[in-house]
Each structure stands twice: as structure tokens, then as C-alpha cells.
Amino acid sequence: MTINHNYYLDLAFKLAEKNLGQTKLNPSVGSVVVKNGTVISSGITSLNGRPHSEFNALNNIKNCSGASLYTTLEPCTHYGKTPPCVNIIIKKKIKNVYYAFEDPDFRTFKKAKKIFDQKGIKSKLIRSKNYNNFYKSYFINKKKSVPFVTAKIAVSKDYLTINKKSKWITNKTSRNIVHLLRSRYDCILSTSKSINQDDSLLNCRIDGLNNKKPDLFIIDLKLKLRKKLLLNKYLKIRKTYLITSKKKHNQTSEYKKLGYKIILIDKLHDKNDLNLLYKKIYKTGYSRVLIET
């Protein structure tokens, strides 16, 4: 019987999509366990990145000896805050492991196959035709130590971004797409000028995604952010960072009392300064940034 490996890998990717942008610096991975042509278990990388998907898929199965594991990314081989995923794969006596991408993390890169070979487990890298760019953000994270950055820009037909006669230059469909987009990023980068003007919550207001509130970074070098804003209601449950000049250090106490976290920078004049800011955001624990301003 011919096995459609891409079918099961695509199932794994559909699982991984669910937590995209919700796993901090770890990639969102999906795993599917197949035995005798039947999916007997599945797993996704947990929120905030741990446990990993392979562990979630295999931990509670009593009898998966001889089964095949399909996972979107090469199983990790190193000890970190959790044991390597190859351990539980070996322990559960998985027969075959198929994965769509090699992990660019130097601690794991191309090492899983060597371990599986030693244990008599067949493993194979199978590229997915439908998800060939899925880990683009993760590869950028690992290569440059910066977050993956996407800019959302709303522009009218006459190439304007503001309409003084209407609050919106977009329609309901495009606004819903923005809410979906926000759900796939762990933080949003905006400016005090934009937030003061719109008083936007910058959250996900769409059925099924209401609980997803990406953390927020606000560039405000001159500390012009208004003290009374709608987003202030969520400062206790949503991390909000105020990025300002070191020269304004002594003027941040009121914002701290409200619940803002302060990030001090020297300047923000060119792309080099912006890249330094991105590195700072990445070190804070964010891998995917959506710019809205």
C-alpha cells in the first residue's frame, strides 16, 4: 500500500498553524502519530513554547510501538528546559519519523537522523509542497537573532492612509483579516502618534480569537502617549512596553504606575538603530512582530 506522506505532514502543519505566534522563541510545531493507516494521536507545541509537540503527541499513548511520527520540524536532540524530543520517540518505540524541515538550531541541526539511525529508527526529510515557507520566521530568528517583522499598511485607492471624513479607509473584510493576522504574532509594534490618534486596542476582535492579545511595543521617544487610553484597561493582563529615549528616563514614573514596562534606547534615526531595537525585542522573548502605525 502506497502511503501518502504529504497528507499526514499537511495535517501536522495545520496543527502547527493554530499556535503560530503563540510559542515565544520556540517554533510552533505540529505532530501526528499514525499506526496501521489511522491517526492515533496528535500534538502541537504548547503556548509559550513548552512542552514540545512530539511530547504532547506521544506522552499519553500507551501503545504506539511500530507507529510512524509525522512532524513539521526535525525533533530536537538537546537538553534545555525540557529533555530532547528524540528521547520520548525512542522510548515509545516509534518505527518511522518523517519531518518537513531540518531545525536550524545548531544544537539539533541534522543530529536527529544520526540518533535515530543508531537506534534502528527510520527517518526521512520530506519537503512539504504546501508549506514550504512556514518556518521562514523561525529561520530568520536563528540566523540573525531578530524577530520576523511584518508591516500592515492600509492604503486607499488614491494612495492615502488617512480619510478625514471616515474613521476607516478599509472595509469589514480587510479589518477581519487584520484581526486574524494579529493572532499569528506574539507582539505588535506601533507608535504613540498612531495610538493617540486612533485609541485602538490592537487586539483580536474576531470570534474564536478573542482571547489572543499580542503584547504591545509603543515607540514614544518624546513621551507623548496619552495617560487615558482604552488599552490601559488591559495593562495587567497584557505586557505593554513603552520605548523611549534614555534622556526621558526621569519622566517615566507615571507610565510605570499605570503598568507600562519601559525600554530605554539611545536614538532611532536609521535602519541600524531600528535593527538594534529589533534585537532588543528578540532578547525580550518575542519572535514575530507585526508593525501597525
Predicted regions and their residues:
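Short, basic/aromatic recognition patches
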Residues: T2-K24
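Active-site ligand-binding patch in enzyme domains
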Residues: I140, K144-V146, T150-Y286
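Short helix-loop-beta connector
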Residues: N63-A67, R184, S287
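Short beta-strand scaffold segments in enzyme catalytic cores
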Residues: S28-G37, I153-A154
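Zn2+-dependent cytidine deaminase-like catalytic core
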Residues: V33-N130, K246
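Short, small/polar residue-rich loop motifs at catalytic or cofactor-binding pockets
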Residues: L25-S28, F148-V149
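Residue-level signal for inorganic ion chemistry
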Residues: A12, G30, C76, F116, ...
